[in-house]
């Protein structure tokens, strides 16, 4: 292995967001021998940046890693090159930029493989990772490692990928849809003038989709269509009331528009996910991606859609670290390589990461580049 390769940072560069997973050692760097391995204890930590603000990500890496690691900047003479695991389309699109600005070379990992690897890592090693959310009730799910497969992974990023997972390294992308997080943000910006995903989500919290959506009760005079199992509050047509209200966009409250849009995207994803699970006889569906962000309304909408169409036979399950699946998968791919050439400056990098993982990493909604996801206690074996 190249001695300049660092084994505790991985990136997933998507169309909307850049996700980072990095290792933070506990206290001073220490080693203890166990079966011929050096064991470093610490935490996996998480951060995110908007892809359109990629310079913020570059500055984060430059200041928090390169500045303290003893690695000279690209303009200096004899600087070291760092090989970092990266996945997502941006690993190709921005490879030259990272090389030019930071002297970083990407060791690229396949996007689908990284997603599956990240989910399997979480489900097998992190307690209380998966949970259901229905009717306002959050329930953690105990995962039986002997009965994990097969399952359907629905990753909601800018678009949506649906992957049937049959085992470690055994998966197939069986479907997807272009109506995902990018659709929500794109239409939301056009319709509400919101500037960011977080701002749009916050706006949706205060909205009422019934002002714009046409419900079954609007068609049936306030009653259910019980013969086919539709309640009066079920949505018959998203944005349907705009047809006959005789109003212009400015006549509607932006929070109601945001709420209706979020409901429309979530319902659509939930239904398509179940239909694909039905094709392959899958009962467990895991939803991931930053579109969800632990938002109760989104999770409940997806869960209701899966529950309704499956008549209660299929489960929608969510993940605490939902937005970092690809980055985690890329990170765990370091396990396939030898670390016997680890050099002292790597230890310095680990301390540098630790220095920026404390109070500076508290989450500030909307304006922060840093994510509120919980850290994961872990150790790294250096062979």
Curated annotation (Swiss-Prot):
EC number(s) recorded for this UniProt protein: 2.7.1.33
Catalytic activity: (R)-pantothenate + ATP = (R)-4'-phosphopantothenate + ADP + H(+)
UniProt pathway annotation: Cofactor biosynthesis; coenzyme A biosynthesis; CoA from (R)-pantothenate: step 1/5
Function: Catalyzes the phosphorylation of pantothenate the first step in CoA biosynthesis. May play a role in the physiological regulation of the intracellular CoA concentration. Functionally redudant with PANK2.
Top-level EC class: transferase
UniProt-recorded Gene Ontology molecular function terms: ATP binding; pantothenate kinase activity
Keyword field contains Nucleotide-binding: yes
Pfam families to which the protein is assigned, alphabetical: Fumble
Tissue distribution: Highly expressed in leaves and developing seeds. Expressed in roots, stems and flowers.
One GO-annotated biological process of the protein: coenzyme A biosynthetic process
Organism of provenance: Arabidopsis thaliana
Record text on activity regulation: Regulated by feedback inhibition by malonyl-CoA.
Disruption phenotype: No visible phenotype under normal growth conditions, but homozygous double mutants pank1-1 and pank2-1 are embryonic lethal.
Protein name as catalogued: Pantothenate kinase 1
Family of the protein in this entry: Belongs to the type II pantothenate kinase family.
Keywords tagged on the record: ATP-binding, Coenzyme A biosynthesis, Kinase, Nucleotide-binding, Transferase
